[in-house]
Amino acid sequence: MDFATHADLTGRLRGLVILLDEQLTSDQARSADELVDASEFGIALEMLADWLSEDATPIPDDVRRDFERLSSQMGNGERVMGALSICPTASDS
């Protein structure tokens, strides 16, 4: 993976963790950050999806699209989006 791709994924995943701040526990957010620090981008995205699906957490469409774009880029779309299919849509308001 080249530097630009690495930096892009790091920034996008950290942004996703920030967007999900109210839906994640502090331990979950910390664990996701540790996975990103270790360049385990696919696992970080899968774990975020799993944590959200455990409680069927409502997810805004824009956040769901972020998951879809990232998982498509990383090649784990079926795994990530399958977990998120349990989560209802939340309003962005």
Positions of the model-derived regions?
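C-terminal-biased regions
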Residues: M1-S93
